[in-house]
């Protein structure tokens, strides 16, 4: 950790952080107390779970606890990058809105503590769908 502090102090890096796919809640809580990492990358979606696309491993979390932890992180100036944003499946906020991944992404980024999101897209049509959602915010 001293290495990263030194690199940041000397201007070599502006920020440092970490990402984790599982068993990360305690890491985020500890970081909220110690304020060492500037940025965290965390699985976050409407379902509170995901299946890893390569390993097939299932992961879930206590959504209320995670939102509380991320709310605290955001209030302390820690950058929160959401990943696995579409891995909870299609989402619709109401019966009159067609379920889809763009709506799932909207659900994620409407949380004020989310600084940015890693969004998986496989083609230009999906890029256009996501841009449309982002432009409507």
Put a short name on every predicted segment.
Residues 1-137:
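Beta/alpha (TIM)-barrel catalytic core signal, keyed to glycine-rich beta->alpha loops juxtaposed to Asp/Glu
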């Amino acid at each position: 950790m001293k290495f990263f502090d030194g690199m940041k102090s000397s201007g070599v890096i502006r920020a440092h952080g970490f990402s984790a796919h599982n068993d990360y809640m305690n890491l985020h809580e500890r970081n909220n107390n110690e304020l060492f990492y500037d940025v965290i990358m965390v699985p976050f979606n409407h379902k509170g779970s995901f299946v890893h696309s390569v390993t097939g491993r299932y992961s879930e979390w206590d959504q209320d606890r995670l939102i509380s932890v991320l709310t605290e992180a955001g209030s302390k100036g820690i950058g929160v990058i959401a990943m696995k944003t579409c891995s909870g499946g299609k989402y619709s906020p109401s019966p009159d809105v067609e379920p889809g991944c763009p709506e799932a992404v909207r659900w994620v980024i409407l949380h004020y503590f989310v600084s940015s999101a890693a969004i998986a897209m496989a083609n230009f049509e999906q890029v256009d769908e996501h841009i449309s959602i982002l432009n409507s915010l």
